[in-house]
Curated annotation (Swiss-Prot):
Name the UniProt record assigns to this protein: Serine--tRNA ligase
Localisation per UniProt entry: Cytoplasm
Family of this protein: Belongs to the class-II aminoacyl-tRNA synthetase family. Type-1 seryl-tRNA synthetase subfamily.
Function (record text): Catalyzes the attachment of serine to tRNA(Ser). Is also able to aminoacylate tRNA(Sec) with serine, to form the misacylated tRNA L-seryl-tRNA(Sec), which will be further converted into selenocysteinyl-tRNA(Sec).
Domain remarks in the Swiss-Prot or TrEMBL record: Consists of two distinct domains, a catalytic core and a N-terminal extension that is involved in tRNA binding.
UniProt keyword terms in alphabetical order: Aminoacyl-tRNA synthetase, ATP-binding, Cytoplasm, Ligase, Nucleotide-binding, Protein biosynthesis
UniProt: ATP binding residues: R260, S261, E262, E347, I348, A349, S350
Reaction(s) this enzyme catalyzes, per UniProt: tRNA(Ser) + L-serine + ATP = L-seryl-tRNA(Ser) + AMP + diphosphate + H(+); tRNA(Sec) + L-serine + ATP = L-seryl-tRNA(Sec) + AMP + diphosphate + H(+)
EC number from the UniProt entry: 6.1.1.11
GO cellular component: cytoplasm
Annotated positions binding L-serine: T229, A230, E231, E283, S383
Subunit structure: Homodimer. The tRNA molecule binds across the dimer.
Length: 426
């Protein structure tokens, strides 16, 4: 959620930032609604003060004093009725909060203006693309031919956008998760967490998924939602807390299943493992101070890139433009891996600095030792990485002419010494 005080004091800049996000100016409407809310709040405070004064006088008067006592009683009763009416008006005046809840984060000054992904900015590349590679198969062709990846029978169980992995591909999935967790905990100092994957609506609201993206998640019949990313569970670990400054940055990593309805993705990536309803992902989250969040963003992006470097995969890092950024983010890097079977780059990681946007929603603060003042933390998240898309990249980049898959060197020990994935044999 955005800072209403900042909006009030920077109306022109606020509207300009909204235009960069392709949203109509809202400053005047917010000022009107905010003014109405503040007026009611001030009246409530005035009446509460009057009630306190009259109640104190009433307590010092003999009940047998007659008209003066009865008059004060009537005054207190009238004040209580007026307060009840004003508080009801305040509770019913939800338009301001509803409007603020639909507004995305303000883009950082370093974010380029742009309409869509075609206007994202290239930051760096790693490795080289073999443009002469011919007859490279896509991952689902390889997996099905090896009889280690099943879509047809799985569709009978769960429908479209699900997959079953078998044998050495199931083992590769487990190996990748262990490898990623080892790198992030051992080399980058993230604390491994095993969080819930069922959360309440308020947790989804805190992280920015609700109310705007309600139709993109799976809801249970008893008030829970399946997480679309472990970011939801991890950032909420500091909801409604005040963290000692010396405990920051708080770096967390989790490996969880993730669930997405893929609403609005009809017809896109209908084959293969690129866009599934259920997938596994290693997620990074950092809680830090406003002064350190930019450096932390680079640190986390480096952690994600390191996984791809160790796997020997070619990728490029893009700075997203204003029209392609996520709702809660003020600055995002996307890491795109090269897929020779598709002959294109595909997003494999997203690394975002959300500033105090999520912290304001979930009331997450920190304070310096010995101080009574508190400040909103900054929250950051990064894919570290999605297991399925990483497997896609390995299958397409490490495929051999006979259809087998060479296991990347860094994963051989995690695969029990296996160096090549071949067709399943019963």
């Amino acid at each position: 959620m955005l800072n209403i005080k900042w909006i009030r004091e920077n109306q022109e800049l606020f509207d300009d930032k909204l235009r960069q996000r392709f949203i109509e100016p809202m400053a005047k409407r917010i000022e009107e609604l905010d003014g109405k809310k503040r007026k009611i709040t001030n009246l409530i405070q005035e009446f509460q003060h009057a009630r306190k004064v009259k109640s104190k006088i009433l307590g010092n008067i003999n009940p047998k004093s007659g008209e003066e006592f009865e008059g004060l009683q009537r005054d207190v009763k009238d004040i209580n009725e007026k307060l009840e009416e004003l508080e009801q008006d305040l509770n019913n005046n939800n338009e301001l909060n509803e409007l603020l809840n639909t507004l995305p984060n303000i883009p950082d000054e370093e974010v380029p203006y742009g309409i869509d992904e075609s206007m994202n900015k290239l930051i760096r590349t790693h490795g080289e693309v073999d443009l002469n590679a011919q007859n490279k198969k896509q991952h689902f062709e390889l997996g099905v031919k090896l009889d280690l990846m099943d879509f047809e029978q799985t569709a009978k169980i769960s429908g479209a956008r699900f997959v079953t992995l078998k044998g050495d591909l199931a083992k590769l999935e487990r190996a990748l998760a262990n490898f990623m967790l080892d790198v992030h905990t051992g080399e980058f100092g993230f604390l491994e967490v095993s969080p819930p994957v069922l959360v309440r609506d308020n947790a989804m609201y805190n992280s920015g998924q609700l109310p705007k993206f309600a139709d993109e998640s799976f809801a249970t019949t008893n008030g829970y939602r399946l997480i679309p990313t472990a970011e939801v569970s991890l950032v909420n670990m500091v909801a409604d807390t005040i963290i000692p400054r010396e405990k920051l940055p708080m770096r967390l990593v989790a490996y969880t299943p993730c669930f997405r309805s893929e609403a609005g993705s009809s017809g896109r990536d209908t084959r293969g493992m690129i866009r599934l309803h259920q997938f596994s992902k290693v997620e990074l989250v950092s809680i830090t101070t406003p002064e350190e969040s930019k450096n932390e963003h680079e640190y986390m992006t480096n952690a994600s890139e390191t996984i791809l470097q160790k796997l020997g995969l070619h990728y490029r890092t893009m700075l997203l433009c204003t029209g392609d950024m996520g709702f809660a983010s003020q600055k995002t890097y996307d890491i795109e891996v090269w897929l020779p079977g598709q002959k294109q780059y595909r997003e494999i990681a997203s690394c975002s600095n959300c500033g105090d946007f999520q912290a304001r929603r979930m009331k997450a603060r920190y304070k310096e030792f010995g101080s009574h003042d508190t400040t909103l933390v900054h929250t950051l998240n990064a894919s570290g990485l999605p297991i399925g898309r990483t497997m896609v990249a390995i299958l397409e980049n490490y495929q051999n002419e006979d259809g087998s898959i060479t296991v990347p060197d860094v994963l051989v020990n995690y695969m029990g010494g296996l160096q090549k994935i071949t067709a399943y044999k019963e």
